[in-house]
Amino acid sequence: MAVLQRRSSRRDLAAVAVFSGVGLVLGGCGLLPGRRREIEVAASSGLTDAVIAVGEDHEPRDVASATEEEFDWDRFAVYTIGTPATTINEESGVIVETGERYSTQEVLFVFHRDGTAVRGAPSGFEFLAHGAGAWWGPRTQLVWDPEQGTRLEDPDA
């Protein structure tokens, strides 16, 4: 279980986003050891323009910055967009195809392929954190459950 921490300095956050994005690209291309091309979970808030990547061991890996309000989804598997707490491929969802590009404003709610929704709330840039992202507060946790899939949990909510 990983705790997602909040950073306060915008300069630190910008550096983290750039370096993490580079690591995500290199890892997705197979240039870094221990990285898989297929990433299980992604979430973008639209305003934060960030993606949370979760590896095979269900631990957060990287935050990658969006460029020009678009995300290159080639690095990700197929996801469903919809409303929070609904399951994948319901009528409210929209399929995100690999290889397509979407405005971050369109990608508000992204689901784990086999589990509970992971929601990116419209928050500011200060919610980016090293290796992960925090949506509801500094104590937000990324939780893996074999029955429910990956989800975000805030003990303060």
Task: Describe the function of each predicted region.
Residues 38-57:
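Post-signal peptide N-terminal segment of mature Sec-exported envelope proteins
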Residues 56-122, 126:
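Mature extracytoplasmic domains of secretory-pathway proteins
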